[in-house]
Regions:
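Gly/Pro/Ser/Thr-rich low-complexity, intrinsically disordered segments predominantly at protein N-termini
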Residues: 1-135, 139-222
């Protein structure tokens, strides 16, 4: 799951180059970057299990990804979750020139403010295609009818296609080797055996239970 090389500018059409040059950056002042409590909770439920799952993964949230534009300026996108197999150290930004490619897995938790940008085929769907993502997950917990899970993925031939849910309504990630499953208005991660990866709250609760049981056993022996 190494960073994916960017497409060479000379392989792009004039329209694609123009799109890369003019796509608005994700910045702290962008109205679609405003996070509300529920939006942050949905991200936290994903971030901690993914970061704990493998020590050789680099997992981050809302980190700027810097990429070169055809006009020699830098562009910036900041997915809610990114995963890449690069050196796991703290970063101020994920610079694709330094990392030699784009993160293969990106995920957006949609908010009311970000919905047009995150789901639009002429916006985030397209920029992640042109930048070389292998998988893009879109989770919309507050869609009009019900929570919505969808995505796009890279085929073996290199094309960018809609990512179908399996028969259980889940996404099987080839990049992560994990399954993404809706649970009410949250998105959870499952391993190959179907076991849900615990959140930090669940791990803390389990640890507290074990400590209480240990204290009880010690009390019975005294």
């Amino acid at each position: 799951m190494v960073a994916q090389p960017l497409r060479r500018f000379d392989t792009l059409t004039d329209e694609e180059r123009a799109f890369l040059c003019t796509f608005p950056d994700d910045t702290e002042r962008s109205p679609w970057m405003v996070g509300k409590d529920f939006h942050r909770l949905a991200i936290e439920v994903l971030y901690y299990p993914l970061r704990r799952y493998r020590a050789d993964w680099y997992v981050s949230s809302d980190l700027p990804i810097l990429y070169p534009r055809p006009n020699n300026r830098l562009g910036q996108v900041a997915p809610d979750i990114l995963v890449a197999l690069v050196h796991n150290h703290l970063r101020d930004a994920f610079d694709v020139r330094v990392e030699r490619g784009f993160p293969p897995f990106v995920l957006e938790v949609v908010s009311d403010e970000s919905r047009p940008r995150d789901t639009g085929k002429t916006k985030k769907v397209r920029i992640y295609d042109l930048l070389g993502a292998q998988e893009y997950v879109i989770f919309d917990p507050r869609a009009k009818r019900r929570p919505s899970l969808s995505g796009y993925r890279r085929t073996a031939a290199g094309s960018w296609e809609e990512w179908p849910l399996d028969q259980q309504g889940k996404l099987q990630s080839a990049v992560l080797g994990l399954t993404l499953a809706q649970e009410d208005m949250l998105l959870r991660v499952e391993d190959a055996a179907g076991h849900r990866l615990p959140t930090i709250d669940e791990e803390t609760e389990e640890l507290d239970t074990l400590r209480a049981e240990l204290a009880r056993l010690r009390g019975e022996r005294s």
